[in-house]
C-alpha cells in the first residue's frame, strides 16, 4: 500500500505517527506523575488491622532510601493504629544473603516496632507476588492498608484489583534523586501491562488527525 503513495505522503504519514506517539507518551507520563504525587495526600483509614509494606531491592543488608521512605510511612501510620500488624513482603533477589523482608523487619524493630507485630513474607520476587503471597497471610475480612512509593501505587493497585483484593493504598514520597528512574520505569511497566490501551489511543488520534488533515 505504501509503495503506491507519493514520497511526500509517506513522509507525512511517518511524521504523523511519530508525533502522535510522542505526544501520547509525554502526555500520559505527565498524567502518571501528577496522579502518583496526588496519592501522597491519601490518609490512613480510621480502622486498620494490617499494614502491608511492599519490598524493594536491598544492598548489603541495608535499607535503601526509597524503601526507607515506605517503612517510615508505615511506622508513622502504625503509631496511631498500634493494634495492627505489619507485613513486610520481599524475597531474596540479586544474590543477596538476606530477604528483603528480613532487612525490612530489622529496620522496623530498630525504629521501635515490637517484633511480635511484624510478619515476614519472604518469597515474593515482584509486585504481583508481594500481593498474592501476602494475601495468604491475611484474613479476607481484615482491613488492610498497602504502603508503597508514590510512583508504585497505580501499578500495585491495578494488580490488587485484578486479584479481587479490596485493600487501601497509601504512599510515601520518593527522594528527588530517584524520581526520574523510578517514575519512568513504572510508567513503562504500566504501558507493558496495558499496551492495548496505549495502542488504541494512538490509532484513534491517528484517525482523527488523518480525517482533519
Task: Locate each region found by the language model.
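C-terminal single-pass membrane-anchor helix
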Residues: 189-213
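Juxtamembrane "helix-exit" motif on the non-cytosolic side of transmembrane helices
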Residues: 2-9, 211-213
Amino acid at each position: 500500500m505504501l509503495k503506491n503513495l507519493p514520497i511526500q505522503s509517506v513522509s507525512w504519514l511517518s511524521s504523523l505517527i511519530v508525533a502522535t506517539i510522542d505526544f501520547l507518551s509525554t502526555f500520559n507520563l505527565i498524567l502518571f506523575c501528577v496522579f502518583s504525587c496526588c496519592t501522597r495526600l491519601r490518609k490512613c483509614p480510621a480502622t486498620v488491622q494490617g499494614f502491608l509494606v511492599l519490598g524493594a531491592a536491598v544492598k548489603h543488608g541495608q535499607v535503601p532510601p526509597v524503601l526507607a521512605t515506605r517503612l517510615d510511612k508505615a511506622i508513622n501510620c502504625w503509631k496511631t493504629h498500634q493494634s495492627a500488624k505489619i507485613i513486610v513482603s520481599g524475597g531474596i533477589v540479586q544474590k543477596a544473603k538476606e530477604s528483603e523482608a528480613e532487612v525490612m523487619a530489622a529496620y522496623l524493630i530498630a525504629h521501635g516496632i515490637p517484633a511480635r507485630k511484624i510478619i515476614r513474607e519472604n518469597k515474593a520476587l515482584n509486585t504481583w507476588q508481594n500481593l498474592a503471597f501476602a494475601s495468604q497471610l491475611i484474613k479476607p475480612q481484615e482491613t488492610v492498608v498497602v504502603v508503597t512509593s508514590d510512583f508504585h501505587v497505580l501499578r500495585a493497585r491495578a494488580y490488587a484489583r485484578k486479584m479481587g483484593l479490596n485493600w487501601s493504598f497509601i504512599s510515601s514520597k520518593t527522594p528527588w534523586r530517584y524520581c526520574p528512574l523510578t517514575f519512568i520505569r513504572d510508567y513503562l511497566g504500566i504501558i507493558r501491562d496495558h499496551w492495548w490501551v496505549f495502542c488504541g489511543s494512538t490509532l484513534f488520534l491517528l484517525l482523527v488527525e488523518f480525517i482533519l488533515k
